[in-house]
Amino acid sequence: MKICVGLSGGVDSSVAALLLKRQGYDVFAMFMQNWHDTEGTLHGDCEWEEDRFVAEMVARKIGIPFYFVDLSREYRAKVVDYMFDEYAKGRTPNPDVLCNSEIKFDAFLEAARKLGADMVATGHYCRKETLPDGTCRILAGTDPNKDQSYFLCQLNQEQLSSAMFPIGDLLKPEVRRLAAEADLPSADKKDSQGICFVGKVDLPVFLQQKLKSCEGDVVEVFDAWYEQSEKYALDCSLLGVPVENLSDEDLLELSRPLDYSGIQFETETYRSGKKHIKKTRYKPNPYAVIAGRHEGAQFYTMGQRKGLGIGGHSKPIFVISTDVASNRVYVGEGEDHKGLMRRCLRILPEEVHWIRPSEKMEPGQMRRYKVRIRYRQPLQDALLICRENGLFVLFDLTQRSITAGQFAVWYALDGEMLGSGVIQY
């Protein structure tokens, strides 16, 4: 069997190649370039040339052929353009998930097959099992601190049938040890950070290359607003209703985020100084205050703390909502601010993906799974409720910063990743 290893220059893919070679497979390595910064769209420490050099040295050390493939056109069309589009809508995409489903196990797989590969192997910390009928299961990696199954949540059966994850049963220290013992050039290389196969990037600068800056208000919302909010009161009451009694509209209501657009600020005139110069100011508002300015609501994301430039508080300030239509960013004080906390999210029917189609839920069904809404989040107990108007995830405990555009991923008790979907809200 001929196997192509996606060699990135990092220690994980290097050890994956090493193990396959030792196991007697016919192995070759291929490095993919996913970006040409010819238009100045990205300014960052991408270091892809150094990564390629290290990858080639690793392949030479192991004794396997090395190839290079340029997938920058596919990456721009399927990942980068999608990122810009989502941020422009006020959503927060996950490019690493798309990089795997659209690039590594699609365009890269196709390129590998042209070189005669039967399978593609990567350095992901996850496990794959093949059932007697040929169906593939994907499970969390053995190392709980490095499990990367989340990033593979959009893979389908065809892709999984051609995938191998040689280090899925190993712990990170074991991988480092194997690399050091084999004297691989990547043994001491730090784990990669930043956008998948592009590198460490200043994201606001990256986005501003394509998305226009536009100043707007940063509005701090006080607890008093929630005390008078009918929507907030309704959500609290619906959470007390038995799940089987919740209608489709009830679930929609629970999953919808709070709407702060009704917060308005009136102005008044006053005279200042010895010359009694006439000036204008905002009238005091018991529910909110204009706390600062920003350069564009699309550059901010739910739960964001850095880059707000708002001081004078005893607790940290977090983004609780953005409105790109009105170009407003809403913030709240404290990690437990009411605007950060929710228990229900919705995934549109067309956005629901089941890794094993046989596990697909039908409208009217409810199942309990373990769910995470971001990479490395501890798994959360939740009830999945399938209705005609979407798949709803109702968590047992309140969740912080449920973010539109991110992926919700659900697992069985044995660690099998069963499905995923883009969070609508």
Q: Where are each of the predicted segments found?
A:
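ATP-dependent adenylation/nucleotidyltransferase module used to activate substrates
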Residues: 1-154, 164, 172-181, 246, ...
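AMP-forming adenylation/ATP pyrophosphatase catalytic core
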Residues: 121-126, 137-425
